[in-house]
């Protein structure tokens, strides 16, 4: 039986099915609904709100060190707060699987910037997984756990606003219980002194090479990466929600290499794919993260010179900029209602900000959502 779910609801289901035991999060659109949907699995998954993203990351990583599969979620600007433990975890590795959700927000629907957190995976030298629809949001959690434990790495699980909030049919599976060995003290692995970090860095680089090979082989078998060959005239390399747009826009016969494991890139697979098409496009939102690496490998491709660096993509934009077709925009002569952002219903800060709004003297506040107060 299939269920109609948002990407966030499906991710929560994926947490349950993957045998994850611990989940900690700090709320922030577009990621909030993941933890909100986990209490229904409370008999199998312990979940809690953390006071900030750094604490959420440390709670989950502590559970991983102890041997449990763990998961933490935050919006993309929250990863700035959590960067300290994340980078260190990249050197130390994991016990049980350790998954960190970063929900990016192209077009700034609910955020103060448009930062592209894919760069964090590259900087921290950890694996990154990107689902493109609700079914993959569920399925890829288990695959991310496989990657994490197989390669001893944290996994950055990157979604976007449209992936989080769009809905699709999701087919459920059964929970797979994860049994872990009892905690064993390992100072060299989990105490990141300078000497230990120095010794671990070569292992991190070796891990990236093994992940690249995995992306070319096993990831094709389990569906994390997908190859769809057409007539060989046009090829598209894409990931995340951009795949859904490209699949709808490009004509029949187009070849697609859809990447779910987007760091490190499976460059041998990409090079082989590029050799089989006459013209290669790289379709991605925000920064030319994949495009720059592909061009650096000496593979000619077309990307950001057409799609641009700003805002989220959509089907009309791709038709206009990539295919040169006239966009079929429809407008109405009605001014939209003014709807400034507001604090979410049930937010404990609503009363505080209401009180502040009634005071005329100067006030200074430091809450992230202060702009909504």
Each predicted region: which residue ranges?
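Flexible, low-complexity linker and terminal segments
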Residues: 1-8, 18, 131-343, 348-352
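RNase H-like, Mg2+-dependent phosphodiesterase core
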Residues: 373
